[in-house]
Swiss-Prot record:
Pfam families: DUF188
Stretches assigned to coiled coil: none
Native organism: Bacillus cereus (strain 03BB102)
Name of the protein in its database record: UPF0178 protein BCA_3127
Family, similarity comment: Belongs to the UPF0178 family.
Entry-linked PANTHER family: UPF0178 PROTEIN YAII (PTHR35146:SF1)
Lineage of the organism: Bacteria, Bacillati, Bacillota, Bacilli, Bacillales
Length: 146
């Protein structure tokens, strides 16, 4: 198992790196050049920089990921593609994407886009909380223990 992180806006990178390093599982952070960092990472963590274009990180993750790798993303489109490839996919708020829930998530995203396109406003995501982080940590630890 390898872990790939859609890292541009991921608020749980620290949890992923800490827990994966303890478990000796390699982590690849995929992020755009606009989020370049000189921060030192453990040797088991690789950072891949991609262009800032739409979905560039998603495409790179899909090129790298193999069946049974673990991907962390908040992007439903990437999650859908990764599930089809046989990957384990987690959201940073602490839930697992599955073939049972991805269709509903994609449908909700589509309907919200149509509402916005018509000029109306939609609610944004709720703020990320410490409880969300701990929920993610528990799920992540259970997934890498398999």
């Amino acid at each position: 198992m390898k872990i790939y992180v859609d890292a541009d806006a991921c608020p749980v990178k620290d949890v992923i790196i800490f827990e994966a390093t303890k478990a000796k599982i390699p982590v690849t952070l995929v992020t755009s050049f606009s989020h370049y960092s000189n921060a030192e990472q453990p040797k088991s963590v690789e950072t891949i920089y991609v262009d800032s274009g739409a979905d560039a990180a998603d495409y790179r993750i899909m090129q790298l990921a193999q069946k049974e790798d673990l991907i962390v993303t908040q992007d439903y489109g990437l999650a859908s593609l990764a599930l089809a490839k046989g990957c384990i996919v987690l959201h940073h708020k602490g839930y697992k994407y599955t073939n049972d829930n991805i269709e509903q998530l994609l449908q909700t995203r589509y309907l919200s886009a149509m509402v916005r396109k018509s000029g109306k406003r939609t609610k944004g995501p709720k703020p990320f909380t410490a409880e969300d982080k701990e929920k993610f940590r528990a799920l992540f630890k259970s997934m890498i223990a398999l």
